[in-house]
Amino acid sequence: RQIRFLSDFHYPQNTKLNAFDLSVIMNNALNNCMENVSGDDPYISISSFRKNSIFMITIKNSFGGQLNFGDSDLPETTKSGREHGMGLNNIRRVARMYMGDISLEQGNEEVILSIMMQVE
């Protein structure tokens, strides 16, 4: 299957952001995107920017389904396995290490994951 991949990602230089921590975020987010991307023109988009001490990452993917949030602000997984469904929790854990958090939105047949961290 062909998936368009768009990137405007810039790693913030001279900050306290650990490359391993960023890899946890990117690996989990991209795995989620690859598992769930759908639509007639499937795409994954990654962008980032830094403003003062704040580093923002936005990851979008086309998605024609419906997320089920249940009692949480994170969607419930429908897949089985002890480790399945831990990706967003791992992303949130890392963001909170940097006094940040994540948000997840769905609309216009896409899912948008936003990650905010303080990197100074």
Residue ranges and their predicted role:
Residues L6-I25, R82:
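Conserved short strand/loop->alpha-helix "switch" segment adjacent to the catalytic nucleotide/phosphoryl-transfer site
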Residues V24-N32:
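Conserved polar catalytic motif of the HATPase_c/GHKL fold
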Residues C33-D41:
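A short, flexible helix-to-loop-to-beta junction within the catalytic ATP-binding CA
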Residues Y43-S53:
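Short beta-strand/loop element within the Bergerat-fold HATPase_c
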Residues I54, G65, G107-S114:
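Glycine-rich nucleotide-binding loop
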Residues F55-G85:
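Glycine-rich/acidic phosphate-handling loop/turn and adjacent ATP-lid/helix
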Residues M99-E109:
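Glycine-rich ATP-binding loops of the HATPase_c
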